[in-house]
Each structure stands twice: as C-alpha cells, then as structure tokens.
C-alpha cells in the first residue's frame, strides 16, 4: 500500500541534534536503579498528570487537584462530564499499559478502542468513525469566539483509507521511533477521524508508540504536561500556518519540520525532567509515601523488603507473621493506596497476588 498521505520528514541537523539529545538522556536513565515501590508511585502520579494536562488542552475546567480527586473516587459514583473525561484518559492509559505488556502492534482497531474509552459515557454518535453530515452542513472545527472554521478535515469517506495508510506506515517504516510518534500524533489530529476525542486519542496513540519503542521512560513523567504549557504554540505547530481545508496543504505539508521540531523539543524537555526526577526523587518519594503509613504498616513494608517478597499472597504472609489473613489484606490495601503495592487479579480473587 502506498502511503502518499503520511507526512514525509527530512532529517535536518536540528532534528538529528534533538534526537541525539533525547537518546543520550534515554541511555542515562537506563543506568539509574530505582526500587519498584518508587517506580510504581511515580508512574501513577505521572498518569494523573497526563490525564489532567491532556484534557486541559481541550478546555477541561478542572484544577489538577480536582482531576486527581476524580481519578481516585469510587468508580460507581456519578461524575460530571469534565470528571468523566479525566477518568477516561487515565483508564485509557491503563488499557494501553496492558497492550504494551503483550507488545501489541499499532492498528486501526487499537485506535478505535482507545477513542471509545476516551469518549466513554458520551452519546453513541461520538464514538467511532464519523459519518456523513446532513445535506448542506459542513463538518469543521470552529473558533469558539468568532465562529469561523479553524479546520475543515477530510471527508468522512476518505477516513478509513487514511487510517490504513497510517497503520501501514507505522508498521513498515524504518524511521526513528521519535519521528514515528510525531507523525502518528500529527496524522491522527489532522485526519480527525472522530466527531470528538481526536486530540486526546492522538496523544495517547503517539505515547503508545514512544512506550513501544522504549521512549516512554518507564511511564515516568508526562509529555502531555509540556504540550499543555502553551496550547496556542501546540496548535500553531500542528497547523503550520496552512489553510483551514485539509485538501489545501495539510495532507502533504511543505514544511513538516515545523511540527517535528516542536514535538522533539517537548520530548527533549520531557526527557530532561524525567532524568532529574529519577535522580533526585528516590528518597523524597519514598519518604512521602511512608509518611502516610502508621507504625504497623511501615513495619509490614520493611518486612516485605527485607524478605525480598516481591510477589506473595496475603495468606502466605499471614502464616509467616502469625496474624490473620484479614490483617494482611488491610495492610496491603493501605500500601496499594500509596502506590507501594500493585494488586494483580488472579482468576476472580483480587489481592490474591501482590507485586511490590
């Protein structure tokens, strides 16, 4: 299959320099030993930051504190739309984590699954590929203040082929993984295959490519946070000064390096932040986690670490300590809440295996 409608990237000196800088940080990060308990806490916090930041770009009004509270709330309660959006993104990140464990390749099905998670709770027409508009109506992204069409994406009939081209590109190209991630981000935003959730889906799928090729830095840090610092620059870089109509240049932009350089610059900042965080946060994060534990819970954690019990069942540990199974489960629950343990579901029994 030809991939005529996927942006072509020429590797300029600036692009190569940025890739080299990111690769250098990636190598440096690989030399840092971090205990699993610290990684788990940092990953959870990073997913929260990404969920908040990615939705903030789209105009979600929640503060970061409110977003975190929504993520941590009982899933059975009723959520307002902004809260549901943040929760959806967090769950989509968890979903992609599971895909990554299986090393699932990038596919159209994966894109559709992710968008359905992003739009969970929305009306049916907002989930899945957009269809034809009523006669006399134009599908476009409009400026909320002026009402002018900011972007007119491709016709709905072209979307399946454009997505097929993107999937073909991702799975056959020999481009550098950072370039692939940038291209996926641009193409999904530009193809605009859905009625809603395009930007969030693009950021999630681009992030999956980074994770797949080892540029997600173990899930630590938030790239979305850097995009959210200046949404105007983010959108301007995607638009590249081109006309609003997709068919008038955005399908084959003359200067794709505008977007690529922006994306790599954000990646560079992100990689530096992750490196600094990984170098300095070990003791701070552990101290912060332990401050929420009482003496018995700290003693329990120390026991697990001393005995190198990185995987265990509560019943096993209860026998070792001479306490009830319920006591161990209660202590495990507190450690789970503080990101110090990860429950693994075996068959139907939650907490039947704990991984520290």
Positions of the model-derived regions?
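FIC/Doc superfamily catalytic core
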Residues: 1-354
């Amino acid at each position: 299959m030809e991939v005529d409608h996927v942006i072509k990237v020429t590797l300029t000196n600036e692009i190569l320099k940025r890739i080299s800088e990111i690769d250098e940080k990636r190598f440096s990060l690989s030399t840092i030993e971090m205990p699993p308990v610290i990684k788990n806490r940092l990953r959870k916090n990073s997913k929260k930051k990404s969920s908040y930041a990615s939705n903030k770009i789209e105009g979600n009004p929640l503060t970061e504190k409110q977003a975190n509270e929504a993520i941590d709330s009982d899933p059975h309660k009723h959520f307002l739309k902004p809260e549901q959006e943040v929760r959806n993104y967090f769950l989509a990140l968890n979903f992609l984590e599971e895909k990554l464990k299986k090393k699932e390749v990038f596919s159209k099905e994966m894109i559709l699954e992710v968008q359905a998670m992003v739009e969970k709770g929305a009306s049916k027409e907002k989930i899945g590929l957009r269809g034809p508009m009523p006669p006399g109506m134009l599908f476009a992204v409009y400026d909320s203040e002026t009402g002018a069409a900011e972007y007119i994406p491709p016709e709905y009939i072209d979307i399946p082929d454009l997505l097929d081209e993107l999937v073909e590109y991702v799975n056959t190209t020999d481009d550098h993984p950072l370039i692939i991630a940038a291209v996926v981000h641009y193409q999904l935003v530009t193809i605009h295959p859905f009625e809603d959730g395009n930007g969030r889906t693009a950021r999630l799928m681009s992030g999956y490519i980074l994770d797949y090729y080892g540029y997600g830095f173990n899930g630590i840090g938030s790239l979305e946070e850097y995009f959210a610092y200046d949404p105007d620059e983010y959108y301007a870089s995607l638009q590249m000064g081109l006309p609003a109509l997709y068919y008038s240049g955005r399908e084959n932009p003359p200067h794709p390096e505008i977007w690529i350089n922006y994306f790599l610059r954000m990646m560079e900042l992100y990689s530096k932040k992750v490196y600094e965080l990984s170098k300095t946060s070990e003791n701070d994060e552990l101290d912060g986690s332990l401050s929420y534990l009482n003496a018995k819970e700290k003693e329990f954690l120390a026991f697990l670490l001393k005995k190198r019990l990185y995987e265990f069942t509560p019943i096993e540990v209860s026998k070792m300590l001479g306490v009830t199974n319920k006591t161990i489960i209660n202590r495990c629950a507190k450690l789970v809440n503080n990101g110090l343990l990860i429950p693994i579901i075996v068959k139907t029994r939650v907490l039947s295996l704990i991984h520290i």
